[in-house]
Each structure stands twice: as C-alpha cells, then as structure tokens.
A protein has these predicted regions:
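Bacterial N-terminal signal peptides that target proteins for export
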Residues: 1-8
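Bacterial N-terminal signal peptides
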Residues: 8-17
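A beta-rich soluble binding module of mature secreted/lumenal proteins
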Residues: 19-174
C-alpha cells in the first residue's frame, strides 16, 4: 500500500464518529513507553498489506506527549515503510486515551489524526490491547514479537470479552 493511500485512510478514520466504551482503568506511562510489536489485529483496509509491525512509543518533552514510529513490512514485496505520528494523552486521569496525529508534509496541519484507547494491558506491561473508541479496529501490542500461541490465545479471549469484532483475525508477528 502506498504511503499516500495509508495517509488518506488514516485521515478518513479520523472522521468516523466515536462511541463511548470503557478503557483500561490506569496506564503508567513510564511503563507503557518503549518498543511494542503488533502480534494480532482484526482485518482493516489501512493495514491490509502490513506485517511485522513494530511500534516505538517515545516520550517527547511534556509528560503527555509522545513520538510514534510505526514500522511495517509490506507483504507483497518486503519493503519496509515507517509512518510517524505525534501522540498526546487526552485523558490524564487514566492515561488510557491518546490522540495520534500524523507528522510530515502530508499531516494536513495536524488534522489527520485518530483517537486510540488502551483497553487492557498486562500488569507487567508485557502486552496491551489498543483500539479505536468505537471498537471497529483493535490491535494486540506485545513486548515480545515471538509471544507463544498460548499467550496469544489468552489475550485474544480478553479481546473477545471486551466486545471487539473477531471476524477476520490477522496474525502479524514473525
């Protein structure tokens, strides 16, 4: 998928209406930052050609600001693409809600953005369930790109219990 298509799809997601759902009660931002690997997600058109996604979540000065770098390997040709965004915490009580805005020339002045919520996470922050506020898309982020199938199944059960769509699962790890 071309970068322009990815950015256009990301911008379109920003226009979708948000519905209120519960998210994780508290997120310790010091433990949440760092490198994550996307190991499972539901099918979405924005990422249809993406595998082995890696997310770097890096603090940027203020306590509620982050730089995001999503590295994706395209399935079709193995080409690596990096999408960069800035994130800010939008709920400082729970620290579980973020607004991601694309950076660079095609950021549309910061208008191309999307809300993401942390719906669940391991006590030791070894994994997290991220999703859109309306639950139409979700991702399992893990610290270990080679998480066992048994652990994946346990986390997927939690995703199912949270009410996310489970129709078309995509295993995105190695």
């Amino acid at each position: 998928m071309s970068r322009a298509c990815l950015i256009a799809a990301f911008a379109a997601l920003a226009l979708m209406p948000a519905t209120s759902f519960a998210q994780a009660s508290d997120v310790d931002l010091d433990r949440f930052d760092g490198r994550w690997f996307e190991i499972e997600r539901n099918h979405n058109t924005v990422q249809k050609d993406c595998s082995r996604a890696q997310i770097d979540f890096t603090p940027q000065g203020a306590a509620d600001r982050y730089a995001i770098a999503v590295t994706c390997t395209r399935r079709a040709d193995g080409k690596v693409e990096v999408l960069r965004a800035n994130a800010r915490v939008t709920d400082t009580t729970s620290n579980a809600r973020f607004r991601f805005s694309l950076t660079g020339l095609l950021s549309f002045g910061g208008l191309a953005g999307q809300n993401y919520w942390v719906y669940d996470h391991a006590p030791d922050y070894s994994w997290a369930v991220m999703g859109l506020p309306d639950k139409s898309n979700w991702w399992i982020w893990h610290r270990d790109q080679n998480a066992s199938q048994a652990e994946r199944d346990r986390i997927l059960a939690r995703v199912r219990a949270l009410g996310f769509p489970m129709g078309r699962l995509v295993h995105t790890g190695l």
